[in-house]
Amino acid sequence: MTDTAKKPVTLNKIDYIIWGSGNPTWGDPRETLGRLLSDHIIWLCSKKAMSASEIAAELNVSTVYVEDELEILRNGTNGKYGVLRRLDNGRYAINFILFDKETAEKAHSIYTEQIPNICKTVESFIEAHREEYLAFPYLNRKTDMNLILWQQIRTLSNAFSDSVTRILKEKYFSGIPKPDRPFSIFGYVNTGKTYGGGCDGAETFNVCGLKKIRLTNIYVTRIKKHFHCGHNVANDGKLRLAIRAIDGLDISTLSEIEKEHAAKAIECGYLYRDGNMLYTKILVSNSADDERLFGISERLKNGYFDSEAAKTAEKLAELIKTFVPDYLLCDWRFANDIAGMPVLDALIEALIERGILAPPENGIGAEGCWMQIEK
């Protein structure tokens, strides 16, 4: 670790990588961050519980400023979940799993050593189930294996981590319940490497003649995000056309504004053109098939990685019990999420190198974006 990482000097920048899991509209405490003072307070409180006066003395800042900042960080955006918690003794402590650089690198290395085996196993699994993937009843006029695999890639990537999670739960953290909140954060001090990505979804109802529509998109190193959680689908001209074009849409029926939206929708991968017709390019399935949508890929966590996952779980459990405070052990799953972050990008690159997966040009396309509908 650098000197700054060990004990930051006031006004030196601390670069955190903080992820979220769940529904951020309930209250995302990351929205209260971004100030140098808050970054330093979080760092100090991640090492030990401290009072406002102790923090002020450590940072050479007025106690009044620190007290104001502490309340912001404790309350978060909804008054229920912040990055800090206030203890009974009046001190403040970190309220989410936050690894320092050295600990994050240790956690990542536990998974990194398993990546060659993970990639080999996933590749074999894909080849063995190719026809089954292609037989899924998508509603698109046409589809291909590449789009299907981009839809499935996170589930395939998570199979090893899910196996580790099961073993951690059964063997090391069996009596510890999940935290009872709709949204959680977890993170680490930037190690200089960028890993993984996310998955955002949006729902809308009674649009374009459909009862319910759910849209999802992933974003990773190779794929840029189309939209965020809670995106207003009904007001998105490109997505409305993608919804209308599932069974085909005659271009001649479109207004000039709709034709402009169509051109943009083709450019970003929502649609493709065949003669005078537009068709939806992102994968579309019936909501009635939701339970089956990832069913094939889910099988990968059933027995394919048991031996290797047991070794990983043992090492990770030791790290968690060493570096995570007892009151945060309910969040142990997020420590596992941090540890497993190198896997997704590594798997994607391995499959691209083998010609099994092809990324979209410039990072924007139909890849990694899909729609589930209820008529």
State where each predicted segment sits.
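Short alpha-helical segments that sit at the start of domains
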Residues: 8-40, 199-240
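Extended alpha-helical scaffolding regions
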Residues: 108-221
